[in-house]
């Protein structure tokens, strides 16, 4: 690529109609001349060849991705990760902002991903290390997406749960219970105060617990709990399956008693999520399998907040994500970035509920609340409710009691002195520390 060719892949924001472009933030490591590498990077993900032989034309004017800003962070002695490559020369770590014309792929998530994190992005000469850090959508692009059907306020209205977090619980044992056993445990947790009892992301439609039978048992238990507590409840059924079975699984689950649906968004694909969101009349909630496999490395892959943003765009009403606990191996800053992506302004797209989770209990609720900074989040313990020494009803009560302490401005330990379910969690924690 000669010097004039390179210039065709650079532009200023002021020279472009930015409503016609997505803005992409990348971290990358280039080998050799930086601007030549960046020009190749833009070319490979858009106009790899921009004219026909012997024809006076240039498709870059409309269709080329263009560098609108870049910063050289530092020169490196070697790449951050060993990647086989043919180029030689100095290695530079860079932050790069690219404007990519969305006319190249339209309002279609599979085509968008093919362009901005596909072959052209990760197989560019001179750019062996790449991480997509963020995507910014213009309102003209967002106008073609429906986004969440219910969102945060819709979920709150269904549950009549305002001014506090929404309390989920992952029914445990997560694998192995019969539908009847599963329903009894969920029922007890609803009596104790959970808003939502959910299937584990690994429990879907299996021979020993079909979605039809499980939804029927849970629907009956849910209605009984609602009658006894006077509170609306949700059974969140996992319908993750082959794409050609999703609509059938949706209908079976809802018809038999599920009033919200769980979907493992990346394993089934965001296009499938969008299809379900457009079809369903109940809340659709996503889980995070598969995402860490390409987001965890600091300088390669795709930042997890990009996937959260795309899940919201595809129509999820809530996004379950790795939370603050040490087991989740996610920096606090990254968790908060994902939480913010659920609720920040996004054109006409409604906010979705962030649900950061992992090894939570009544004893971590205050920490999560303080870190999130408001009540617009879901709190999703598993063993923190269903492994409670006094049983799942007491486990759910301990969550509600912890929230009461927070509302009253009283320490968990002090509030626990007059609330035995919460005290049991405090005592259990002390025993673990002694071990």
From Swiss-Prot:
Family: Belongs to the RuBisCO large chain family. Type IV subfamily.
SUPFAM superfamilies per UniProt: RuBisCo, C-terminal domain (SSF51649), RuBisCO, large subunit, small (N-terminal) domain (SSF54966)
Cofactor(s), names only, from the UniProt record: Mg(2+)
Keyword Magnesium part of the UniProt annotation: yes
Cofactor note as given: Binds 1 Mg(2+) ion per subunit.
Assembly: Homodimer.
Function of the molecule: May be involved in sulfur metabolism and oxidative stress response. Does not show RuBisCO activity.
Transmembrane portions of the chain: none
Keyword field: Magnesium, Metal-binding
Taxonomic path: Bacteria, Pseudomonadati, Chlorobiota, Chlorobiia, Chlorobiales
Annotated positions binding Mg(2+): 198, 200-201
InterPro entries: RuBisCO, RuBisCO_lsu_C, RuBisCO_lsu_C_sf, RuBisCO_lsu_fd_N, RuBisCO_lsu_N_sf
GO biological processes: carbon fixation
MF terms (GO), sorted A to Z: identical protein binding; magnesium ion binding
Name of this protein: Ribulose bisphosphate carboxylase-like protein
Keyword Metal-binding: yes
Modified residues (N6-carboxylysine): 198
